[in-house]
């Protein structure tokens, strides 16, 4: 067994040669080798956006003069540096900042996911942990990525620190994905429970992250520029690890250091769109009604410097580099994959069919109808940075295997009470799509994973699939359609082939949305 694994690892490191020699055993070896490559590539992708190296590149401190440089801006430190943070990656960001800034840091407060310190310690990731006698106070909360009382206490502690600052002080704000849930501070009389219920209803009806954040900001003391306002007149530097498509700073963690550009009318439009305006609690109506006469958040944030440290684009650039080193012709399709997960899955499924046809039949390719349908699906998704033409041209000109890379956050409309996440649901739906298309002599594998290591309320980061998924599942007595109808993708993957198709990384300490890999290897 050990010898067989060594052979497979060798194959995973040498994809430029043929992986298939014919026969079921060879095909199984190819499948395992591709899966190993996919896992390695995902690890490299995540490694490119870990908080420590990112902070070290963004910050530099002159130990003699106490001058802190943030990109091209300079700040003088003289026992006037404070720190707050919130998000899934903030523990590691704070540890890196503490290591760099040392005794210059006076005080800090961070809000991080429940159990993350124990998880990092258990995983041996000491670089993600604060020093034993740290000046940074840590609050853990937002279990299952939902705002709760513990996160509320953290938010109030952050607000208290910010409100105590003066014009001589500098506030370093660390922000990453998951920050919205970890910084809940509703505007009275709205309660945490009321705000949470409204957010859940919107999410269940398919609201986008941008729409959710618009509502959150309107009902929050700290989001939508509220934290920047609380810290005024202190200087504020926000270091942001983006988990939002396109990296809009006003959307990431609901923009606590960016003045909100949305009006009450924007909120009412969203609530109308999802049929919730007439069902609003009285407290929410009260806050929205007075917002026009008493605008929340500062009109400007001239005292704030917002810096994007890392993003999905940075992660995929590393994935492309690593895939090419493995012998693939690699193309980044898009860093802005959005839309309904069903539509995204259909696009990936047909993309595999069309690209696979070009690889299997050079000079012939897919039918005109299939090509046209692929471009129609792409147009429906409205992806601003989609490189579909470039990807297909690369496939046509490729002498060997191809890896198509993408990132973003598809939306899952909840219809059942199953357990899953958008990455596992996307992978399962793509598996179904792959099984519907004849892929000929091309070996195909699709992987979808969350860079934070947690896909929904599960312990998996995502999953990978192959065209044989539906038939193999049926042989095990598993009906894929039933699991999808109940949004129960995690349960499916746990049962299917003993969970072998699940992607397990543990909490990574970073978060730059999701990564999607489509591997196409000619036999």
Curated annotation (Swiss-Prot):
Enzyme Commission number(s) of this protein: 2.7.1.31
EC top class named in words: transferase
InterPro entries: GK-like_C_sf, GK_N_sf, MOFRL, MOFRL_assoc_dom, MOFRL_protein
Main location: cytoplasm
Location in the cell: Cytoplasm
GO cellular component, one term: cytoplasm
Residues recorded as bearing Phosphoserine in the entry: 60
Molecular function as annotated in GO: ATP binding; glycerate kinase activity
Chemical reaction(s) catalysed: (R)-glycerate + ATP = (2R)-3-phosphoglycerate + ADP + H(+)
Protein name from the UniProt record: Glycerate kinase
Organism field: Bos taurus
Lineage: Eukaryota, Metazoa, Chordata, Craniata, Vertebrata
């Amino acid at each position: 067994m050990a010898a067989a694994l060594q052979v497979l690892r060798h194959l995973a490191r040498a994809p430029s040669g043929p992986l298939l020699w014919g026969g079921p055993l060879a095909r199984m070896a190819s499948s395992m080798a591709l899966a190993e490559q996919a896992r390695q590539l995902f690890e490299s992708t995540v490694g490119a956006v870990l908080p420590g190296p990112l902070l070290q590149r963004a910050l530099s401190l002159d130990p003699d003069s106490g001058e802190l440089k943030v990109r091209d801006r300079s700040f003088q430190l003289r026992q006037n540096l404070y720190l707050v943070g919130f998000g899934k990656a903030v523990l590691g960001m704070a540890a890196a900042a503490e290591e760099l800034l040392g005794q210059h840091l006076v005080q800090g407060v961070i809000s991080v996911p429940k159990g993350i310190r124990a998880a990092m310690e258990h995983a041996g990731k000491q670089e993600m942990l604060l020093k034993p006698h740290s000046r940074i106070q840590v609050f853990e909360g937002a279990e299952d990525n939902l705002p709760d009382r513990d996160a509320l206490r953290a938010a109030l502690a952050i607000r208290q620190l910010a409100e105590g600052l003066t014009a001589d002080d500098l506030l370093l704000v660390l922000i990453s994905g998951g920050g919205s849930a970890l910084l809940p501070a509703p505007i009275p009389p709205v309660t945490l429970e009321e705000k949470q219920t409204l957010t859940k209803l919107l999410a269940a009806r398919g609201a986008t992250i941008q729409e959710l954040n618009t509502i959150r900001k309107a009902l929050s003391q700290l989001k939508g520029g509220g934290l920047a306002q609380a810290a005024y007149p202190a200087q504020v530097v926000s270091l942001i690890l983006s988990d939002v498509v396109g990296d809009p700073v006003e959307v990431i963690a609901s923009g606590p250091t960016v003045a909100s550009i949305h009006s009450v009318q924007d909120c009412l439009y969203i609530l109308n769109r999802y049929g919730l305006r007439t069902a609003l609690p009285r407290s929410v109506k009260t806050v929205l009604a007075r917002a026009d006469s008493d605008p929340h958040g500062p009109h400007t944030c001239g005292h704030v410097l917002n810096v994007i440290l890392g993003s999905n684009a940075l992660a995929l650039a590393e994935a492309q580099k690593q895939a090419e080193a493995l012998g693939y012709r690699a193309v980044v399709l898009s860093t802005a994959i959005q839309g309904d997960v069903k539509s995204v899955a259909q696009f990936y499924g047909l993309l595999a069919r069309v690209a696979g046809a070009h690889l299997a039949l050079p000079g012939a390719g897919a039918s005109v109808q299939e090509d046209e349908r692929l471009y129609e699906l792409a147009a429906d998704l409205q992806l601003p940075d989609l490189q579909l033409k470039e990807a297909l041209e690369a496939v046509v000109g490729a002498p060997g295997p191809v890896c198509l890379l993408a990132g973003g956050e598809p939306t899952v409309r909840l219809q059942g009470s199953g357990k899953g996440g958008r990455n596992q649901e996307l992978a399962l739906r793509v598996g179904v799509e792959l099984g519907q298309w004849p892929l000929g002599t091309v070996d195909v594998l699709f992987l979808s994973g969350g860079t934070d290591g947690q896909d929904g309320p599960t312990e998996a980061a995502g999953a990978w699939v192959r065209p044989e998924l539906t038939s193999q599942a049926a042989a095990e007595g598993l009906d894929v359609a039933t699991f999808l109808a109940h949004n129960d993708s995690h349960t499916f993957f746990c049962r299917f082939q003993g969970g072998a198709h699940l992607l397990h990384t543990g909490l990574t300490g970073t978060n730059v949305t999701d990564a999607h890999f489509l591997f196409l290897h000619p036999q």
